[in-house]
């Protein structure tokens, strides 16, 4: 249902999706599919000759795909360097023009400057390099203190779709950071799915069944979330089964507002979250779409290097939803005005 919703929105307002890790047959196949289906306008960042030779050697068509070479676009790099200087001031490196020949940095600059709507990277680059490019070129949203991520977990056979956060960015979040992650994840879930988030703050304890500094950290984070978003349905600390299985919730957390029906799972650490999503993916029959990076001033998202063509396509569709929702809202308002 979620991917179908994203597909419908994409057909109404296709996004410009830039791929900096373009020398990858998975990206070429995904880009060709998005283009042929009218779901997006893919932009590949690479040397055109090198990319076409690569595509030819792998038997992948490139008909209709736009390719941009950072080395051959000095004017764009100069524009991006000027924007970088205006935003970062003295922190801008003296060799900014040269650094912008890097596909990751160039793609991040395209999104920051409005030359593309979404950047999808990470199929070849490490998460650290993707985040570094995002932070250096795009920067954080105004008021944002914590960069984080969320995976959209989609069932292949049965079960509900879920959000898993944070599985990629913050290793040992403080209570304040955990609260930031929960609030950002709730907002992302609502924007992408159109559903109200039901947030579970996970731990190895349910409602004080264990005492430990890690448990106290989750409890404190839950209170911060409640103070900052009193209308949000949130509970913690909870074990996964108490957050996900109504029958278990009735035993372990009978007073929980979630009643075992949480749809956004906030893990207490990166270690727990990363292990958890991979178990759900490899043993539980769930597809992992993402991670969607939360907190950057423009959308730049990170794939797992083990991603499939389908996962690249789905992340491109999902990542564009907030922008498409805004486009549709503006269109509706314009219609009302007219």
UniProtKB/Swiss-Prot annotation:
Coiled coil: none annotated. It is found in: Cytoplasm. Activated by pyruvate, unaffected by NADH, ATP and PEP, unlike Pta. GO terms for molecular function: phosphate acetyltransferase activity; protein homodimerization activity. It catalyses: acetyl-CoA + phosphate = acetyl phosphate + CoA. It is an enzyme of class 2 (transferase). Its EC number is 2.3.1.8. Keywords: Acyltransferase, Cytoplasm, Transferase. One of its GO terms (cellular component) is cytoplasm. Pathway: Amine and polyamine degradation; ethanolamine degradation. InterPro entries: P_Ac_Bu_trans (IPR012147), P_AcTrfase (IPR004614), P_AcTrfase_dom1 (IPR042113), P_AcTrfase_dom2 (IPR042112), Phos_Acetyltrans/Butyryltrans (IPR050500), PTA_PTB (IPR002505). GO terms for biological process: ethanolamine catabolic process; response to heat. It comes from the Bacteria. Optimum pH is 7.8. Homodimer. PANTHER family: PHOSPHATE ACETYLTRANSFERASE (PTHR43356), PHOSPHATE ACETYLTRANSFERASE EUTD (PTHR43356:SF1). When expressed independently of the eut operon it can restore growth to a double pta-acs deletion mutant. Belongs to the phosphate acetyltransferase and butyryltransferase family. This is Phosphate acetyltransferase EutD. It comes from Escherichia coli (strain K12). The lineage of its organism: Bacteria, Pseudomonadati, Pseudomonadota, Gammaproteobacteria, Enterobacterales.
């Amino acid at each position: 249902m979620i991917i179908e919703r994203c597909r419908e929105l994409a057909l109404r307002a296709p996004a410009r999706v830039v791929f900096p890790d373009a020398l990858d047959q998975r990206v070429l196949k995904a880009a060709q599919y998005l283009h042929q289906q009218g779901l997006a306008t893919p932009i590949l960042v690479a040397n055109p000759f090198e990319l076409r030779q690569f595509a030819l050697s792998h038997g992948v068509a490139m008909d209709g795909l736009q390719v941009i070479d950072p080395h051959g676009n000095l004017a764009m790099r100069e524009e991006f360097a000027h924007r970088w200087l205006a935003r970062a001031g003295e922190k801008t490196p003296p060799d900014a023009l040269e650094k912008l020949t890097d596909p990751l940095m160039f793609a991040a600059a395209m999104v920051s400057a409005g030359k593309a709507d979404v950047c999808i990277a990470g199929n070849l680059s490490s998460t650290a390099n993707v985040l570094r490019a995002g932070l250096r070129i795009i920067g954080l949203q105004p008021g944002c203190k914590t960069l984080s991520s969320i995976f959209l977990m989609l069932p292949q056979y049965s079960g509900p779709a879920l959000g898993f956060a944070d599985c990629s960015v913050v290793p040992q979040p403080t209570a304040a950071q955990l609260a930031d992650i929960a609030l950002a994840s709730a907002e992302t879930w609502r924007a992408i799915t159109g559903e109200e988030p039901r947030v579970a703050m996970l731990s190895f304890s349910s409602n004080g069944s264990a005492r430990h500094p890690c448990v106290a950290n989750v409890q404190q984070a839950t209170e911060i979330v409640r103070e900052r978003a009193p209308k949000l349905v949130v509970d913690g600390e909870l074990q996964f089964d108490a957050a996900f299985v109504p029958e278990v919730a009735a035993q372990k957390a009978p007073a929980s507002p979630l009643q075992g029906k949480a749809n956004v799972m906030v893990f207490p650490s990166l270690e727990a979250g990363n292990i958890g999503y991979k178990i759900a993916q490899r043993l539980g029959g769930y597809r992992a779409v993402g991670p969607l990076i939360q907190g950057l001033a423009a959308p730049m998202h990170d794939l797992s290097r083990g991603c499939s063509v389908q996962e690249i396509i789905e992340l491109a569709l999902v990542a564009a939803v907030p922008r498409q929702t805004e486009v549709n809202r503006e269109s509706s308002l314009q219609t009302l005005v007219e």
